[in-house]
Curated annotation (Swiss-Prot):
Cited function: Catalyzes the conversion of 4-hydroxy-tetrahydrodipicolinate (HTPA) to tetrahydrodipicolinate.
EC number(s) from the headed UniProt entry: 1.17.1.8
Disulfide bonds: none
Residues noted as binding (S)-2,3,4,5-tetrahydrodipicolinate in the record, renumbered to the chain: 144, 153-154
Superkingdom of this protein's organism: Bacteria
Keyword Oxidoreductase attributed: yes
GO CC term (a single one): cytosol
Taxon lineage: Bacteria, Pseudomonadati, Campylobacterota, Epsilonproteobacteria, Campylobacterales
Active site annotation, chain numbering: 143, 147
Protein name according to UniProt: 4-hydroxy-tetrahydrodipicolinate reductase
GO biological process: diaminopimelate biosynthetic process; lysine biosynthetic process via diaminopimelate
Length: 254
């Protein structure tokens, strides 16, 4: 049984992880970090706005915050090593560089999406992108109206898998919007388009289009619980790993 600390306990994902930990046989909640008031808290769980106290009362920290919060956590952990599961998206190149540096001192699992279904979707996308080399690739992602980053980290990861499968640099071929007289689509272009509205938890579709036929592969999340359970599984797995930067594929053995 490992002790879990949550960084970003007042957020939607933090609250979902708290709820899912109630039924876990492998992990228990021991500490919550938040700068905002919380409602009811399980008995015996420490609530704090001090990273020192958070780290002192758990074996693994799970982070679902915003870019600034996640980077601050990772920087702190560089001198106070603790296994970290980072689920915050939109970290950018500076965040990626920091993750690689910090992973020399502790095990870190970083994933833009913690669901098993999305992990398989990425593998299928790689296979299709390589096999269907003449097909055009378009990605559409849909999320609730409150999501702050676009395109989603999951969609960008999906695009990265497709680009890698074709030996392309994603930065050279990605298109995140079209407007006006843009001309014909280029051969290597990978479009990633974002839809925002309502309470959509998450829906990602990658399409492969050719003359006479097309294939679309879709993943729809109907509850944040799928991400929460994935993060808990990742935390349990990470607790016994050596220093290094890991992905959800390492955890799932994919």
């Amino acid at each position: 049984m490992i002790n879990i600390g949550i960084h970003g306990a007042s957020g939607k994902m933090g609250q979902m992880i708290i709820n899912c930990l109630k039924d876990s046989k492998d992990a228990k909640l021991t500490a919550l970090y938040t700068i905002e008031p919380l409602g009811s808290v399980p008995e015996g769980v420490i609530v704090t706005d001090d990273l020192n106290e958070l780290f002192a009362n758990c074996d693994v920290v799970i982070d679902f915050t915003i870019k600034e919060g996640a980077l601050n956590l990772i920087n702190y952990a560089r001198t106070n090593p603790k296994p970290l599961v980072i689920g915050t998206t939109g970290l950018g190149d500076d965040g990626t560089n920091l993750l690689n540096l910090a992973a020399n001192a502790m095990p870190i699992l970083y994933a833009t999406n913690m669901s098993l279904g999305v992990a398989v979707l990425n593998r299928l996308a790689s296979l299709a992108a390589k096999t269907l080399a003449e097909f055009d690739i378009e990605i559409v992602e849909q999320h609730h109206r409150h999501k702050k980053d676009a395109p989603s980290g999951t969609a960008l990861t999906l695009a990265q898998h497709a680009a890698n499968a074709r030996g392309l640099n994603l930065k050279d071929v990605i298109v995140t919007g079209r407007d006006g007289l843009v001309g014909a689509r280029s051969k290597d272009e990978i479009a990633v388009l974002a839809v925002r509205g309502g309470d959509v938890v998450g829906r990602h579709t990658i399409g492969f289009y050719n003359e006479g036929e097309f294939i679309e592969i879709n993943h729809t999340a109907t509850s944040r619980a799928t991400f929460a359970k994935g993060a808990i599984k990742a935390a349990v797995w990470l607790s016994s790993q050596k220093n290094g930067l890991y992905s959800i594929y390492d955890c799932l053995g994919l």
